[in-house]
């Protein structure tokens, strides 16, 4: 039998065997591939016979060998796809799916209490016509201090021990720089400026039950014509009553902040004893909750705002402070320790 006839028979017989392959024949398919196309396979053995052919026949037979190899390689690849598909279908046919079985329970997280407090406060201010403005946590000394009426070497800078990155770059100690930047750009011909600037701030404090090197503030600013201390008091009363209950009262005590004049500390009537005096309010009936005041004329002037024509008020409150008072939390570190047992209380 000549070599060409043997090649044709090998191709025909192999194709016939491949046509019979089913899903359970994956092992047989691999064995057949090795037996036909492997290094010691039938096609390789036939190829060795080329050397015995006359020189004029070798090109023709060599071409036929390559064609048979290509045809069988493609046939094996197609057969492998058929076998794999049949195997998958057989597996699907043998399995049943009970759609009435309950699914796997997934433990879902919840919003952190500080995020809940921030969103609640933001919603209150949005309802009062304020805008929310975000700013940079890494700030310049100029905007963090000088624009807040705290020039270099001002003694009040000691009140805010600061993380400096360079002599002029720092981690902001309050969100007031956002107010200064917004004040620079505001067009008062379109109306007064009413904004809050929530965010994280940093102080070089030693962490303990009441202090943290990072915490969250929400500072507010209103600037327009004829803004008075009465406007400030009315705004703060509305905020406090929405946060702590309509029966809450506030009182203003004189204080000092470089960027407001006059400045006040704001107290709220104790929500545990109703102002009668208890351990929470240290028998005074009042709890200190935030600082505020009328915007210092110098702060307005540095933004190019005429302090003779415009006035304003500013205030700042801490999210941690609000949460601790509302929920009786006595350690600020609880907010940052990631204890699931703590977080689950505020779902």
Curated annotation (Swiss-Prot):
PANTHER family: PHENYLALANINE--TRNA LIGASE, MITOCHONDRIAL (PTHR11538:SF41), PHENYLALANYL-TRNA SYNTHETASE (PTHR11538)
GO cellular component annotations of the record: cytoplasm
Enzyme Commission number(s) of this protein: 6.1.1.20
Name this protein carries in UniProt: Phenylalanine--tRNA ligase alpha subunit
Stretches of the chain forming a coiled coil according to its record: none
A GO MF label: ATP binding
Residues binding Mg(2+): 261
Hydrolase is among the record's keywords: no
A Pfam match: tRNA-synt_2d
Superkingdom classification of source: Bacteria
Cofactor section: Mg(2+)
Family indicated by similarity: Belongs to the class-II aminoacyl-tRNA synthetase family. Phe-tRNA synthetase alpha subunit type 1 subfamily.
Keywords: Aminoacyl-tRNA synthetase, ATP-binding, Cytoplasm, Ligase, Magnesium, Metal-binding, Nucleotide-binding, Protein biosynthesis
Gene that encodes it: pheS
Gene3D superfamilies: Bira Bifunctional Protein, Domain 2
Signal peptide start-end: none
CDD domains, per database record: PheRS_alpha_core
InterPro entries: aa-tRNA-synth_II, aa-tRNA-synth_II/BPL/LPL, Phe-tRNA-synth_IIc_asu, Phe-tRNA_ligase_II_N, Phe_tRNA_ligase_alpha1_bac, Phenylalanyl-tRNA_Synthase, tRNA-bd_arm
GO biological-process terms attached to the record: phenylalanyl-tRNA aminoacylation
Catalytic reaction annotation: tRNA(Phe) + L-phenylalanine + ATP = L-phenylalanyl-tRNA(Phe) + AMP + diphosphate + H(+)
Keyword Zinc-finger: no
Subcellular location: Cytoplasm
Ranges that cross the membrane: none
Species per Swiss-Prot/TrEMBL record: Streptococcus thermophilus (strain ATCC BAA-250 / LMG 18311)
EC class: ligase
